[in-house]
């Protein structure tokens, strides 16, 4: 993400913080001196923009894209990040893959067979996310 500076924003800074578009709103709100009055998923990264310490966000990030056309028939492509780990299903017709982005930022070596513990851990979190997203309020769980 590239941010153009203004008053108080440190020029030329770089960071490894993983932020998402949902983090822009709370950042702008904090910069305006206001408060978000309800629960939201995004988190402010204003301290980072001001050149202050910004702890990493302790959260999972989930990504979904629904594919159309005859080949995919509306199936989804899924991914999640937990720290340096990424679990991804790049096509509805492929297996889930696991990557350690600190060692393999290009995602060239699938570790799902070598690190079964991490694969199961992230897989369980992904299942919960998918089930929550598809939940219908009146259905029993």
Tell me what each language-model feature is.
Residues 7-13, 17, 22-101, 132-136:
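C-terminal cap/loop subdomain of S1 sulfatases and analogous C-terminal strand-loop tails that border
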């Amino acid at each position: 993400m590239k941010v153009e500076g203004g008053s108080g924003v440190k020029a030329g800074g770089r960071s490894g913080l993983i932020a998402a578009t949902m983090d822009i709103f709370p950042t702008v709100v904090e910069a305006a001196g206001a408060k978000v009055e309800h629960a939201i998923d995004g988190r402010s990264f204003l301290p980072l923009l001001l050149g202050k310490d910004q702890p990493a966000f302790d959260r999972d990030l989930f990504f979904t894209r629904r594919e159309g056309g005859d080949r995919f028939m509306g199936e989804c492509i899924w991914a999640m990040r937990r720290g340096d780990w990424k679990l991804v299903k790049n096509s509805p017709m492929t297996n889930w893959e696991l990557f350690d982005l600190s060692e393999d930022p290009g995602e060239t070596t699938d570790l799902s067979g070598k690190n079964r513990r991490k694969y199961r851990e992230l897989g369980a979190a992904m299942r919960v996310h998918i089930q929550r997203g598809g939940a219908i309020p009146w259905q029993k769980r």
